[in-house]
Regions:
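A short loop-to-beta-strand structural motif that recurs across blades of beta-propeller domains
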Residues: 77-80, 122-124, 168-171
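Repeated scaffold domains used in trafficking and secretory/extracellular systems
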Residues: 48-53, 100-107, 140-149, 190-198
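Short loop/turn segments that connect beta-strands within beta-propeller blades
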Residues: 83-86, 127-130, 174-177
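Residue-level detector of Asp-centered blade-edge/turn motifs that repeat once per structural unit
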Residues: 56-58, 109-112, 149-152, 199-203
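Short, solvent-exposed loop/turn segments at conserved positions within beta-propeller repeat blades
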Residues: 70-75, 118, 162-167
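A short beta-strand motif characteristic of beta-propeller blades
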Residues: 38-44, 88-97, 132-137, 179-186
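Single conserved hydrophobic/aromatic residue that forms the stacking wall/gate
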Residues: 211-214, 218-221
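Beta-strand-rich domains and repeat architectures in extracellular enzymes and scaffolds
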Residues: 8-29, 33, 37-77
Length: 221
């Protein structure tokens, strides 16, 4: 089931965020238009950590990732707009600061037309040509791997913890100014998985996979 309210914060696209939407159902809305078509495989190698594709407008495909620099050169995040037919780069962002944290990050197409990217301990707001509009240092100095846009357009992200020795935190931000909306919410445990979201008549809910227990179903989150 598709909820129009749940996706109000995203660009009007069939795949504006990882897994296609906040419920992470990986459902494609509309026709794939593959009947009577010929299969064609294109492979590109760039020696980078390629994380995910999203779609913005028709035939606007964006790829995000980071660098697998666990040793040696300082790592950085990046976003590029690619040709959907041959995967050639149309435009690419400058190197995106990640606070020297290496993890896969996330990307989304916002309803205001911008591209939101979270990588390491930074969030970047980019225009459709991958130019940096705003760089935001997140309040938690840790790699982040969760990114959702809520129905009001605000952005929520979560830091990742590879063990339960330190708790994770949910941070909500204004997509225009980059300012915090409320104080970051410290979860009761660490969380390695990504976050999901759903909405009903009583509120909008964020779900976090914790190490030993599920997150509370609390609309104040």
């Amino acid at each position: 089931m598709k909820s129009s309210n749940l996706m109000n914060g995203y660009f009007n696209s069939h795949w504006p965020v990882e897994c296609g939407g906040n419920r992470r159902q990986k459902i494609f809305y509309g026709s794939l238009n593959v009947a009577n078509k010929t299969h064609h495989l294109t492979t590109k190698t760039n020696n980078r950590w390629n994380v995910m594709f999203i779609f913005r407008d028709n035939n606007e495909v964006y790829l995000t990732g980071t660098m697998p620099n666990f040793l040696g050169d300082k790592p950085f995040g990046w976003v590029k707009k690619v040709n959907p037919d041959n995967l050639e780069t149309i435009c690419e962002s400058p190197n995106l600061e990640c606070g020297e944290h290496i993890w896969c990050g996330a990307i989304a197409a916002h309803v205001n037309g911008t591209i939101i990217n979270v990588n390491g301990s930074y969030m970047h707001v980019l225009d459709e040509n991958c130019n940096i509009l705003k760089e935001i240092k997140l309040p938690v100095d840790q790699a982040h791997n969760g990114l959702l846009i809520l129905s009001d357009g605000s952005v929520v992200t979560k830091d990742i913890r590879v063990s339960n020795s330190v708790t994770s935190t949910l941070t909500r931000l204004n997509p225009e100014s980059g300012e915090l909306i409320g104080q970051p919410l410290k979860l009761p445990e660490g969380s390695m998985g990504r976050i999901a979201c759903d909405i009903d008549d009583t509120g909008e809910y964020i779900y976090c996979l914790l190490y030993t227990s599920p997150s509370p179903r609390d609309p104040s989150i």
